[in-house]
């Protein structure tokens, strides 16, 4: 009996520690990019996957202690995919007492009509979904639209654009829609996918499969995802360093003439940021920038097991 209590206490401690880390990550992202302001009405896009469930849970948690007032409304788009369990999200949200709206639009039928069998449908589906969500945000009076993309998604997009698109372009934590009417935020921008996976499992969210449409997976993105996972295992700290690099750009040491006036460099010009690397090799730190050993690596005997609530 005592052993079972110790196990449960340890599991609760680990869950609280994980939730604190996710809260901290989300809080830092919100502060760094001014994602949420006083009086905001946040439309939380809920797909039924681990990421959007986690986003809603952490935002609800932060809402209770935030120094500003903001409201949340969860929105799910029922695209009429065969086998979609329509009852799951309403039951879950009603249990939480969260305001929500289920938008029913047969985008599945449109996509199946327009895209040949066996081809990836994600691009058209995404465009249709985006338009519907923007319209819904207007109807609900939402000032911000929250999406559940995390740090790994942002890095994957960076490498996809580098490898296949020839661009240094990632996925912004905050953006304005093309029509200038909607601000989109990604509160999980600093969160690791593996933390989200563990959190979703511990919370036992009622996950809805993402392959109901029968679309072929994005093989290019899968290749990039596998590459990053391999690097994370073989080279601890590399993922953290790459993400830090996205936040510390030195235009004078790249090759984009739109970002830096290389032609304007002449005798008497100011010294550019980044240092003079014309002759000397730059010294690289032995430990990856922005990386610290994971908290989960703490030896079990040093863990306090008396913390059972997130303060």
From Swiss-Prot:
Its EC number is 2.8.1.-. A motif (PP-loop motif) lies at residues 47-52. One of its GO terms (biological process) is tRNA thio-modification. It comes from the Bacteria. [4Fe-4S] cluster binds at residues 122, 125, 213. Binds 1 [4Fe-4S] cluster per subunit. The cluster is chelated by three Cys residues, the fourth Fe has a free coordination site that may bind a sulfur atom transferred from the persulfide of IscS. It is found in: Cytoplasm. One of its GO terms (molecular function) is magnesium ion binding. Pathway: tRNA modification. Coiled coil: none annotated. Its cofactor is Mg(2+); [4Fe-4S] cluster. Its main location: cytoplasm. The keyword DNA damage does not apply. It is an enzyme of class 2 (transferase). One of its GO terms (cellular component) is cytoplasm. It catalyses: cytidine(32) in tRNA + S-sulfanyl-L-cysteinyl-[cysteine desulfurase] + AH2 + ATP = 2-thiocytidine(32) in tRNA + L-cysteinyl-[cysteine desulfurase] + A + AMP + diphosphate + H(+). Keywords: 4Fe-4S, ATP-binding, Cytoplasm, Iron, Iron-sulfur, Magnesium, Metal-binding, Nucleotide-binding, RNA-binding, Transferase, tRNA processing, tRNA-binding. It holds the Pfam family ATP_bind_3. Homodimer. Belongs to the TtcA family. NCBIfam families: PRK10696.1. The thiolation reaction likely consists of two steps: a first activation step by ATP to form an adenylated intermediate of the target base of tRNA, and a second nucleophilic substitution step of the sulfur (S) atom supplied by the hydrosulfide attached to the Fe-S cluster. Catalyzes the ATP-dependent 2-thiolation of cytidine in position 32 of tRNA, to form 2-thiocytidine (s(2)C32). The sulfur atoms are provided by the cysteine/cysteine desulfurase (IscS) system. This is tRNA-cytidine(32) 2-sulfurtransferase. It comes from Salmonella arizonae (strain ATCC BAA-731 / CDC346-86 / RSK2980).
